[in-house]
């Protein structure tokens, strides 16, 4: 008998599943007989419980299991016979009108959409390019020096000097202070501290507080008003004005290490050669610039593909991805040490837009890959693993680590497929190259 597939919408379908009752009953009887061999009941030895008693106790459970299995098997058979590309899980409901000799169920489900990808020649992509020169290397060296800063008491002579004749606190100094804060002459939580250190100019303290500390010398005090921002994290004081008295206890000036052989050795250059150090920094910056530009252009390519593609998105797949994103959010909370993160009440609705984009993009990419043979080749995967491993001390061990886990390899395969798609689209789209600084590139990629 031919199966009738009803169209309920653009993607929603329904078919009727009919299961002969005698076939179902035979399976129920067979399972109960098998179950009876191991059933234990008071007053009977194992396997000696009368079949009728086993049936009385377990027939309902066994019938439900058999129907579930048979419905699933029959739906699979129908979907193959009708070439249905089912998206997500179907729902099964018994029909209101049942025949005497058969069970009847309605299976409602969605199918994968037809994906229409427009003319790639109309897609527009801006591709960032970055050059790494001496300026970028010098800026990186400045950052590395600041990460290794040492502080010395201002005004006290030492091997690196005394910080100058002026002993007042300046931007960049690490100061240690006592402070007392009050609102309407009443102390408040967090408003008082002793021997509190911070670096002037880093922005750790509110601007009024830093301004008050600037110019003070050890032993000096200053009283000032400070208005807490309306969005201040301490809700009890947000938007209120407090009066603070700050006492300077210690002032230390920053000493940055010289760029010499010892500095180079601290960066892993064994012989302390400064030329090698700069070459390695340049190589690392170029690798990072490549990673960032690839990430930015990938996002632009994906946006361009979505713009020129037409498709309906199965709700079932969106809902599945919403739940996946909820679980990812809970895992993230758990990694941050949030208690009971696995049960955190995160509403799936907050991920609706993100999930729809992810599913839509996945369908578009799958169509593009299939139509143009953009699958990842083993040699491409190995090349990416090798490139990733270069930034580690023992690249061979990293390669072994990757190839010892199928999930990690699958993630790399997905990355290669995306790269193939990006290269394919860039070869056909309207691409505009734009030179950007490394700093601008870093800022853009962090916002992407």
Swiss-Prot record:
Keywords: Cell cycle, Cell division, Chaperone, Cytoplasm, Isomerase, Rotamase. Consists of 3 domains; the N-terminus binds the ribosome, the middle domain has PPIase activity, while the C-terminus has intrinsic chaperone activity on its own. InterPro entries: PPIase_dom_sf, PPIase_FKBP_dom, Trig_fac, Trigger_fac_C, Trigger_fac_C_sf, Trigger_fac_ribosome-bd_bac, Trigger_fac_ribosome-bd_sf, Trigger_fact/SurA_dom_sf. It is an enzyme of class 5 (isomerase). It comes from Burkholderia ambifaria (strain MC40-6). One of its GO terms (biological process) is protein unfolding. GO terms for molecular function: peptidyl-prolyl cis-trans isomerase activity; protein folding chaperone; ribosome binding. It catalyses: [protein]-peptidylproline (omega=180) = [protein]-peptidylproline (omega=0). GO terms for cellular component: cytoplasm. This is Trigger factor. Involved in protein export. Acts as a chaperone by maintaining the newly synthesized protein in an open conformation. Functions as a peptidyl-prolyl cis-trans isomerase. PANTHER family: TRIGGER FACTOR CHAPERONE AND PEPTIDYL-PROLYL CIS/TRANS ISOMERASE, TRIGGER FACTOR-LIKE PROTEIN TIG, CHLOROPLASTIC. Pfam families: FKBP_C, Trigger_C, Trigger_N. The keyword Ribosomal protein does not apply. Residues 172-257 form the PPIase FKBP-type domain. Belongs to the FKBP-type PPIase family. Tig subfamily. Its EC number is 5.2.1.8.
